[in-house]
Amino acid sequence: AVFVLFYLLFLLILGIPVVTMELAVGRASHKSAMMGFKTLEPKGSKWHWHGWICLLGSFVLMIYYTVVSGWMVDYFWKFLNGSFNGMGPEKVAATFDAMVADPYELIFFMGLNVLVGFAVCAGGVAKSLEKVTKVMMLGLLGLIVILAVNSLLLPGSAKGVEFYLLPDWNRAVEAGIGNVAAAAMNQAFFTLSVGQGSMEIFASYMSRNNTLGGEAVRITALDTFVALMAGLIIFPACSAFGVEPSEGPSLIFVTLPNVFINMSFGQFWGSLFFVFMTFASFSTVTAVFESLIGNCMDDFGWSRKKTVLILLPFVFLGSIPCALGFNVWSDVQIAGKGILDMEDFLVSGLILPLGSIIFALFCVSKYGWGFDKYLEEVNTGTGMKMPRWIRPYFCYVLPLLILFVLVKGLM
């Protein structure tokens, strides 16, 4: 609960401001990460070098996200064919362990994500897929509410609600308030994907009808709603089924199947949930692939087809170590972290905060785009206006807070 409080605070004072900055650069330039900075920067400056950081961040994100996205497809198939029918909590946990222990299974579903993702981008049907995904996301939002209500009604769920929503400051002090705050800051950056140009690519297609402050609030509010509702599904269910809340990413693959199994028509609800999650994760895959493709086309002058043919094997081969890190290479440690944890650290602990600092300085510094031009772009359109008096916070406090995240993550 203390983490959640910090998370909400940092979304407000860090997340929304940086989102407006990335959106502003994208909408004003109508370009990809590197070309966007090159279009807006003062002549002769090197802000556009940040595009290489964005390119690296997108690549590293994809070489582990495609593996996790493959888990979604795998679980959809397992629910669809009835593999979970009649399972108890221990067997559900064993199913997840068996999945990650099988390198061929992980590589197959990862490869399926990579192949289909690049095929969609190569065929130019990403926008058509986006329309389908929007409908699926509305369905997912409705299903999340249903699952949250169901979790809250489970016997023994009250302890999970207390753990999630009632702050335990003594426990937070034991863990270190600074550590909790830094983790919440990292989570705010990661959930919004700010700092590596993803929002900039999205904004390059945006109209100028609405102010970017309002757009940033709406994006953050929707993201926060999903995150909070996910907590209301998972933590009460953890309490009800005796699953430790500290199990991390596997929670969705251990706790939720238990919820579905104990629901009427559980196979249907489980299949529906994981097909929605598959579309959600796959939309992220195609969006980041589009970012990679767009950057390479702009930077190297390649055609779309050539770019896809070059990137596909690089992403596929680059993703194999993450898949093997759960089994064949499970003993491999890099600075005390497993392969997935190290790749996640590079993105959420290093590239995202570093990129966010660059966006912040570019938008407020007279040696970059400048605060006045940034503010003019943010306030273009109807909706919430960004006040000029906020400039000192954006110029001095915001970069220092982001720097704290970066330094804390490296310690």
What is each of the regions a protein language model found here?
Residues 2-6, 46-59, 107-113, 173-185, ...:
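Select transmembrane alpha-helical segments in multipass membrane proteins
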Residues 6-42, 66, 237, 241-244, ...:
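Juxtamembrane transmembrane-helix boundary signature
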Residues 31-53, 66-126, 155-182, 247-253, ...:
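Inter-helical loop and helix-membrane interface segments of multi-pass membrane transporters/permeases
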Residues 35-36, 69-101, 204-209, 214-226, ...:
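Helix-loop-helix connectors at the membrane interface of multi-pass transporters/channels
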Residues 46-62, 97-99, 112-136, 201-209, ...:
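Membrane-water interface regions at transmembrane-helix termini and the short interhelical loops
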Residues 50-55, 292, 299-312, 344-402:
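C-terminal membrane-solvent junction of multi-pass transporters and transport-like membrane proteins
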Residues 103, 107-108, 222-229, 267-270, ...:
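Loop-to-transmembrane helix boundary motifs in multi-pass membrane proteins
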Residues 130, 134-282, 306-307, 314:
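Membrane-embedded translocation segments of transport machinery
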